[in-house]
């Protein structure tokens, strides 16, 4: 690395091979070594002023960049002013205050909440939830509630009484006792089953396997002599594998008529 007037230089080959610190080639063309990191553009004065809250350089300070260009050209700022014709350059590099930065313009923030509270049309009017518009007039709900009078106390523990005439002038008992004749169990005749004794060893079960055309029973105690012979023969002749649940009407018909069904293949 060759240092001339505080500026570091190195040849092109050493810079490409990342050996600029070891370069001592004075016989080759040299290049200025750029400092590591991001090159600063603002001057030191603007950096210090940026730390305060009321100063904003806004990226317009190029004093440091211009000073490096002058150093590369080997000219001073006075010579640069004469050459460019701009006699109003910033002299912060000479210790004077930088003129690139500008103070922030503080804008007056409009307080929207205060404006809304002042200009609100419903400021002096009752709340919408507590007022009612009747014929273009706003009436408070409190006045309406007072006109209704006190609420009568209702005993919630008392049972509810049905009307004496019932519903549609029909007595209420008819809604509980009225049943169809087809569903009434009392209308069926179970004379053949009255002699049976319900015991643990004598039970009658109804298989639930589905077949729409055939029916079948399974009688667990075929030696029950108290049953009618017609009922016993009918139950034993039914197919146990192809059966479905029977209605009370079918049982009544079997018991009364003694229908015999053959085995189903």
From Swiss-Prot:
Residues 119-128 have a biased composition (Low complexity). SMART domains: Copper-fist (SM01090), Cu_FIST (SM00412). One of its GO terms (biological process) is intracellular iron ion homeostasis. Zn(2+) binds at residues 11, 14, 23, 25. Keywords: Activator, Copper, DNA-binding, Metal-binding, Nucleus, Transcription, Transcription regulation, Zinc. Residues 1-40 bind DNA. It comes from the Eukaryota. Trans-acting regulatory protein that activates transcription of the MT genes (metallothionein) in response to copper or silver ions. This is Metal-activated transcriptional activator protein AMT1. The gene is AMT1.
């Amino acid at each position: 690395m060759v240092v001339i007037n505080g500026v570091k230089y190195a040849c092109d080959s050493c810079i490409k091979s990342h050996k600029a610190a070891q370069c001592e080639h004075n016989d080759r063309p040299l290049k200025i070594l750029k400092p590591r990191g991001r090159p600063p553009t603002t001057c030191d004065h603007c950096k210090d002023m940026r730390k305060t809250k009321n100063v904003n350089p806004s990226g317009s300070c190029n004093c440091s960049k211009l000073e490096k260009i002058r150093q590369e050209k080997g000219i001073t700022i006075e010579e640069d002013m004469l050459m460019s014709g701009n006699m109003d350059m910033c002299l912060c590099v000479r210790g004077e205050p930088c003129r690139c930065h500008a103070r922030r313009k503080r804008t007056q923030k409009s307080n929207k909440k205060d404006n809304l509270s002042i200009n609100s049309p419903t400021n002096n009017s009752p709340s919408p939830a507590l007022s009612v518009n009747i014929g273009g007039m706003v009436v408070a709900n409190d006045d309406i509630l007072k006109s209704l009078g006190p609420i009568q106390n209702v005993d919630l523990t008392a049972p509810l009484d049905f009307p004496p005439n019932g519903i549609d002038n029909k007595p209420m008992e008819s809604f509980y006792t009225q049943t169809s004749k087809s569903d009434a169990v009392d209308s069926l005749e179970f004379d053949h089953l009255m002699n049976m004794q319900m015991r643990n060893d004598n039970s009658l079960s109804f298989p639930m396997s589905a077949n729409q055309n055939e029916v079948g029973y399974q009688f667990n105690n075929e030696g029950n002599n108290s049953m009618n012979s017609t009922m016993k023969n009918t139950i034993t002749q039914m197919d146990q594998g192809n059966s479905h649940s029977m209605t009370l009407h079918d049982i009544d018909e079997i018991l009364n008529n003694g229908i015999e069904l053959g085995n189903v293949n």
